[in-house]
Amino acid sequence: MKIISFGAIFLNNAQVNKKAPDNTYQKANASFVEMNPKDSKDMKALENIQKYWEYEMYASNIYNMALKVRKDELSPKKYKIYTLTSQTTDFDKMDDRKILGAVQGETLKKDFLYIDYLQVNPQYIYFPNADYKRNGSAILDSLKEHFSEIMLKPNKGSTEKFYEKNGFRKVGDLMFWSRNNNEPKLVELA
């Protein structure tokens, strides 16, 4: 029996900054979508971004996690993969060239996400005149629409400041955000 699967699911619009012809940045909509590792087109898009973003190990880690979900080694209910894309329609045919960033996380309990990996397309990080800006913040804003609590372990250095700027607070080695400003409860990461 052949299993029928559908492609990425649109979750919400997200606001990014897009470079205008006059070299200023204007607010623009992007789409935040949940990828489906069981869908071959979604997997191809994830495979391609890990190739295009070859020096960014998080893109490879996200793709490898999707492979494990696809092979039923990990639960698709627990392990989630989302992308931010400039694509606005036809999410059953994800255009990997329009992916602005990707995030993979674990739903540890209802409305609680632990972010394992968040990667913005490197061409929008390392270049001062990039076509798109605010991609990482748009990903976090979108996750905040769908989860009441979010936790992660940041890299040392500037990523900690990035998460603080986006409303996260430091709790030991972790960063935590809560919609209701709750204190984090210890959650088993297994």
Show where each model-derived region lies.
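Non-catalytic substrate-recognition and accessory regions of acyl/acetyltransferase enzymes
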Residues: 2-130, 138-190
